[in-house]
Every structure is written in C-alpha cells, then in structure tokens.
Amino acid sequence: MSERLKNRHVLLTGAGGGIGLAVAEACMAEGARCSVIDRATAAPDAVRALQQSHPDKLAYIAADVTDTQAIAHMLAEAQVAFGPVHTLFNNAAVFDLAPLLDSDEASFDRLFAVNVKGMFFVMQAVLRHMVEAGTQGASVINMASQAGRRGEALVSHYCATKAAVISYTQSAALAMAPHGIRVNGIAPGVVDTPMWDHVDSLFAKAEGLPPGEKKRRVGLEVPLGRMGLPSDIAGAAVFLASDEARYITAQTLNVDGGNVMS
C-alpha cells in the first residue's frame, strides 16, 4: 500500500461490521489509526479479530450516536487513544420500511434520530474539535445513499434521512471551507452487507418474496451487473480522506455501479 493516510487518526461510526469495518481496515492498510465506534457494549467478533491483527492501530469505543453526551465521551476516548482526529467517517444508520399510508411515529422518530440527528451531532462535535485543534488535512465523509437521490414508495423515511445527509454535507462543506476542512459524502447503491440481509427480509415479508430474492433482483438491475461490496465503498472513502482529494469538497460521490447518474 502507498500509506496515503500514514499517521492519521480516522474516527468511524457504525463500524462494528459491514461497510464501516471495511473502511477501517482499508484506512489501516494505508497507515491510519482507527477509532471504531458502534453501539454494542462489547466489540463484535469481527472488530476483535481486526484489533488482534492491528493492536496498535485500532481502538473500539461503544457509543449511542443519538445521545449527545455519549458523543462527547466517544470523542474524548478517541483522542486519548490516538490524538486529534483527522477524518470522520460518519456511517451509523438504521433502515426500516415505511409505506406512506401505514408508517407510524415510532418508525419516523427512530430513523431520524439515528440517520439525521446522530449524523449531525457527531459531525458537529468532530468539526468543533478539528477547528480547535487546527488539524491539517482534516475531512469528514458522511454516508448518504442512492435512496437520498430519489424517493422510493416503501422507504420514504429512509430516503428523506439520506437526502438530509446530502444537504448537511453541502452546508457543512461551505461552513468549514474557511478552516481548510473538507466535507464530502458517499452515496452507495445496493451493497452486500448484513444490513442488506435485513433489508431483504423486510422486502420478502412486504412483497411475498422468498429469502434472498430481493437481493438477487436488485443485483441484476445494477448496470454493472452485481451488488456492491464493502471494499468498493472503502476504496472511495480512502480516496476522499487522502490528499489526492484535497480540492474536493461539498460533493456526494455515487458508488453504485451506475444506478444513479449525476
């Protein structure tokens, strides 16, 4: 590897598995130290395995991103582990089906609490830290989705939350530009992760499909002919965190095999 992130500290939320953990692994391969954040009290098995192979590069911190006090404690612990944060990979999110006429307040509140409130207040806390620390080459990467680019009948709340991520990314980028801090987003398409296994089970129930059928169909519908892999997203994240992207800000990069054109 080229060590594009050598000696940098990357803080990743929603990184107990799937895309978040794949990004952490890719960042460490490029020389970064990673604070891996997830809501589980104990580090998931996959995190522990990665920590054993990179004992000096990975710290696991349990935190609920919907709790602003927990966010403050998380950030303090991360600094104790590895010093000032250079990059935030803001990935924590939840998914649920929300048919427009049947959706209830609880589903609405849950998705917006994690996907919007949590995303914003984690970003705000880390940006304040970056400004105060005067961190050189600092950047934020917010995880959006192709669902934030267009409405979908069965996932209205999720689409709205991810559209909010794109909007906050643009606003934050303009606010932080005078400080030399870049803020970008990534909008994945359909990515083969445990979260998508959950999505598949929800659609199986809603549409009367056998398990795995929704995943099979959406993969075939992608112009490149397959679902994405966490490593596909990780490559984009490393690029955006690196100096190679030093003149890129306020953008949300589609990494979706051609599903969305912009």
Q: PLM features: what roles do these ranges have?
A:
Residues 99-100, 107-112, 218-219:
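Substrate-binding pocket helix/loop in short-chain dehydrogenase/reductase
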Residues 145:
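Residue(s) in the substrate-gating loop at a strand-loop-helix junction
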Residues 128, 174-175, 246:
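Alpha-helical segment proximal to the catalytic Tyr-Lys
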Residues 123, 161, 169:
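Active-site helix of classical SDR
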Residues 177, 182, 248-250:
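Short, small/polar-rich loop/turn modules that mediate ligand/substrate recognition or access, typified
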